[in-house]
Amino acid sequence: MAVVKVYDQNKQEAGEITLAPEVFEVEVRPEILHLVVRAQRAAFRAGTHATKTRAFVSGGGLKPWRQKGTGRARAGSIRSPLWRGGAIIFGPQPRDYEFKVNKKVRKLALRMALSSRLAGSNLLVVKGFELPEVKTKLFAKIADTLGLDKALIIAPEENTTLALSVRNIPGITIATPEQLSVYEILKHKQLVLVEGAVASVQDRLK
């Protein structure tokens, strides 16, 4: 059972918190993480790419010159794939890249991602962020004090002041426990859990 120190926004110790081993101390299997990240990335794809086959390209219905007697190579259409401006054969067509991953596997992957951050000493628990106003400069100073570089911050609920203060800082992202994803955890080098969000994360994944 992992006992982790809790810090305030000035990097001063503010207590300790016990993290559930079934959520934060799971054996990491790269193939599971890879599968879930691939599924999440595939779901983001628009799949709107399209090329014109001979069925869709305009023109080319008339034979450009007679079959014999011209000395030129025979041709049946100006929209042959061999011609400039011609059709594309076996080119990409609109499609849906999404594929299903079982809910149990998705939850397991989230537990593994959280465990990897704890095992790599890249998990930080903070008491909270006290921001009197929307001020990027103010949060940038807090991030510098906490040593945050490329970090995902999990807040207990949506906080407009915090979100607006963070959005212009490269590499730092805010999310709630409901928005937690394997891709976002692995994409960011550090994971910052606001103390109030720990229980929600654990309840969701137990």
Curated annotation (Swiss-Prot):
Top-level taxonomic group: Bacteria
The name this protein goes by in its record: Large ribosomal subunit protein uL4
A cellular-component GO term for this protein: ribonucleoprotein complex
Function: One of the primary rRNA binding proteins, this protein initially binds near the 5'-end of the 23S rRNA. It is important during the early stages of 50S assembly. It makes multiple contacts with different domains of the 23S rRNA in the assembled 50S subunit and ribosome. Forms part of the polypeptide exit tunnel.
GO BP field: translation
HAMAP family from the UniProt entry: Ribosomal_uL4_B
Subunit-level organization: Part of the 50S ribosomal subunit.
NCBIfam families assigned: rplD_bact
GO-annotated molecular function: rRNA binding; structural constituent of ribosome
Gene3D superfamilies in alphabetical order: 3.40.1370.10
Pfam families in alphabetical order: Ribosomal_L4 (PF00573)
Keyword tRNA processing: no
Keywords: Ribonucleoprotein, Ribosomal protein, RNA-binding, rRNA-binding
Gene encoding the protein: rplD
UniProt similarity note: Belongs to the universal ribosomal protein uL4 family.
